[in-house]
């Protein structure tokens, strides 16, 4: 929401694709302050119903970005529907995810794109892996991992390895 507000306060439009239906108007209001209604006018919120609808939405977003005046695209969470789709149609799921990532990569050449994604623990090698694997990883310019324990920290994996400790408060992240 902070990234979106940065551009919304400059009177630019932001596209927010919310697959998990987790966008909190209350949190947006809290962070945006008294002008939140004006900022909402420039926020384009998409709520895809499934992985195919997400695919269509990303294609539509590409057209909107081409038309101009969009300053940022946020996808929260890319792999939410992908994970479910993969249980029945893995080949098609991977093909669609590749296409979606390619579109997002093209968009990112014009404007910033922020994608949140799910991870899972690999039992075989005891590591945390990205849902969508190499499809997502190789097409991402920057990879950031949020770790809760033993302390809250952000691990920037790419472009260069770094770690930052943080806490959360009403204003968002507070870096230590």
Can you name each region flagged by the protein language model?
Residues 18, 47, 77, 148, ...:
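Flexible glycine-/small-residue-rich
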Residues 1-60:
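Conserved P-loop
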Residues 38-41, 68, 138:
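Structured loop/turn residues at beta-strand edges in well-structured enzyme cores
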Residues 48-53, 58-135:
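P-loop NTPase motor core
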């Amino acid at each position: 929401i902070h990234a979106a507000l940065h551009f919304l306060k400059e009177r630019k439009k932001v596209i927010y694709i919310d697959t998990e239906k987790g966008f909190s108007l209350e949190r947006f209001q809290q962070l945006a302050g008294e002008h939140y209604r004006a900022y909402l006018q420039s926020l384009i919120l998409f709520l895809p119903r499934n992985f195919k609808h997400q695919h269509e939405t990303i294609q539509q977003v590409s057209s909107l970005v081409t038309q101009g005046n969009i300053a940022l695209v946020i996808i929260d969470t890319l792999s939410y529907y992908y994970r479910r789709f993969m249980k029945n149609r893995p080949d098609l799921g991977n093909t669609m995810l590749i296409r979606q990532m390619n579109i997002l990569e093209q968009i990112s050449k014009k404007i910033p794109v922020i994608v949140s994604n799910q991870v899972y623990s690999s039992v075989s090698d005891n590591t945390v892996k990205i849902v969508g694997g190499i499809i997502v990883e190789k097409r991402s310019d920057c990879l950031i991992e949020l770790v809760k324990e033993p302390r809250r920290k952000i691990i920037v994996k790419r472009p260069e390895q770094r770690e930052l400790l943080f806490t959360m408060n009403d204003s968002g992240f507070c870096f230590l």
